[in-house]
Structures are given as C-alpha cells and as structure tokens.
C-alpha cells in the first residue's frame, strides 16, 4: 500500500531461516515488544544470513469497495504539500502516488506541465464515500483538479473498474510495462533506470532539487548527452515520502556508474538509497 502498510514485512508473522550455523525459527505472534524484531532482521538480510524456507504471512481480504481519483496540479510544490497533508490525515489511502510533470509525461498521463496524483481507497468491509470526500477536500485546499463524475463512478458499485481507467489506468499500464521496455531500450542505445530514496518532509524540497541537479550533472558528464530525470512519490509516511527517480539518457562510451560513484549517494544530502 502507499500508506500505513508500505512494506511486505508488515504482513509477515513468522519466518524460518536455514543458516550455515543452524536454523532460526521465529514465533507466531501478533506482535512483540521483547527486543529487536527478528523477522525484520531475517527479511532485511535478503539472503546474506541464510535461506528463508518458510514464512507465515497475514492474508488480506479481497477489496469489495473502491474509490479513486486522478488529480492534476499546476504546481509540483503544492502537490507535494497535498500528499503530505494526506499522509498525516489518518485517512490511509491505499494508493497515493504523485508523478512530477516529467514523470507524468513519460507515463502518458500528462503533457509535461502538470503533476498528477493517483489517489485511491479500498476496503473489503465498507463503502468509502466519507474517506474520499475528506481526501478531496484536502486536494481542493491545495489547488488540485479532478473529475467529480469519474470519482462517483468509481464508488458506484462493488467491483467497479473505474480505478483502471483514465490517468490512473494509463499510469498503471505504463508502470507494469516499464520493465519490458527497459531491456530492449538498452539494445537501442537508451539508458533507463530508477533508484529509490527516502527523506523527511522538512527536507524534501531541497533534496528533490539537489538530487535532480546533481544526478543529471553526473550523467551528462559521463555521457556528454542530454538527460531526463523524473520523480514519482510512491509511498508515504507521516514523517516523509519515498521519492523514486528515473534517469533516461543515450548510451555512449563512458561510465555512468563511475560518475554516479563520484557524485555520491542521496545519503550525503540527508536521504537514503532505500526506503
């Protein structure tokens, strides 16, 4: 999910790890305050400590009710303020993904001048009119524009497919197809890759600006080619977002990796290369 449960770790109840020195089996408990969480350690090790052979995962009921909206913002900084307010509202939308103008254009959902917010709620238990109504009040407070009729259609009946139409549907299709486009693009001389970061809200504006300027400068230095660097915010915590940056440039002789290593990682300007 975009908020609240943003990691698969949140749904893992217990694990069994086979390591060179023996087997680690964690207990099945709904929660524990007895020291560091061993399941987080096991999952976060990503195979460096051993092989996970079993896991208990909390299943989620299939959603019966949905509500969705595609929102346009003329100014990216107002869109960021909006998703911050949503993240801190307690509404916990299941989808709250913000595309900057260039990312929106790459995804085929914008013209490169407006930021796009893909906003959605889902539940297996109850209709979501009240949640969406309050979220759209927040959107309106920050200058967002949306199609009211489309929002109503998304909530009109159980099993509505409105959330897969319009800008939300176009972005979803582009997101799913991107890995299939990336590898053939390399063969055509195009470098395209994405890296994830995390930062607190109070430092986001400067972080966003510095990452775009510094990474673009490093790639231009390595390739002597123009570069496009876009951003999407995919996951939100009350204290900060997880911005993903995508680089697109032409491939030439030279080492982009060495240039990026010389530039350093977002950690150096207060962020992280993982969320």
Residue ranges and their predicted role:
Residues 1-97:
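FAD-binding subdomain of flavoenzyme oxidoreductases
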Residues 61, 67, 72, 80-263:
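C-terminal substrate-recognition/cap domain of FAD-linked oxidoreductases
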Residues 270:
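Long, contiguous binding/interaction regions
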């Amino acid at each position: 999910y975009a908020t609240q449960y943003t990691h698969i770790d949140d749904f893992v109840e217990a694990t069994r790890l086979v390591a060179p020195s023996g087997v680690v089996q964690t207990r099945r408990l709904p929660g524990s305050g007895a020291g560091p969480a061993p399941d987080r350690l096991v999952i976060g090790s990503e195979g460096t400590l051993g092989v996970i052979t079993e896991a208990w995962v909390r299943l989620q009921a299939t959603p019966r009710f949905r509500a969705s909206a595609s929102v346009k913002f003329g100014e990216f900084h107002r869109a960021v303020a909006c998703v911050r307010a949503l993240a801190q509202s307690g509404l916990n939308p299941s989808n709250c993904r913000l595309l900057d103008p260039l990312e929106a254009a790459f995804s085929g959902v914008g013209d490169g001048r407006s930021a796009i917010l893909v906003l959605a709620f889902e539940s297996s238990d109850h209709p979501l009119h009240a949640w969406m109504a309050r979220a759209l009040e927040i959107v309106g407070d920050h200058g967002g524009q949306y199609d009211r009729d489309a929002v109503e259609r998304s909530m009109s009946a159980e099993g509505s497919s409105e959330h897969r139409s319009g800008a939300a549907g176009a972005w979803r299709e582009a997101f799913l197809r991107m890995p299939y486009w990336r590898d053939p693009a390399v063969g055509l001389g195009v470098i395209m890759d994405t890296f994830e970061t995390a930062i607190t809200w109070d430092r986001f504006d400067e972080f966003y600006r510095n990452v775009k300027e510094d990474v673009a400068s490093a790639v231009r230095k390595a390739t002597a080619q123009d570069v496009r660097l876009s951003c999407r915010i995919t996951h939100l915590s009350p204290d900060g977002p997880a911005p993903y940056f995508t680089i697109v440039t032409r491939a030439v002789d030279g080492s982009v990796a060495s240039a990026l290593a010389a530039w350093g990682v977002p950690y150096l300007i207060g962020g992280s290369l993982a969320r």
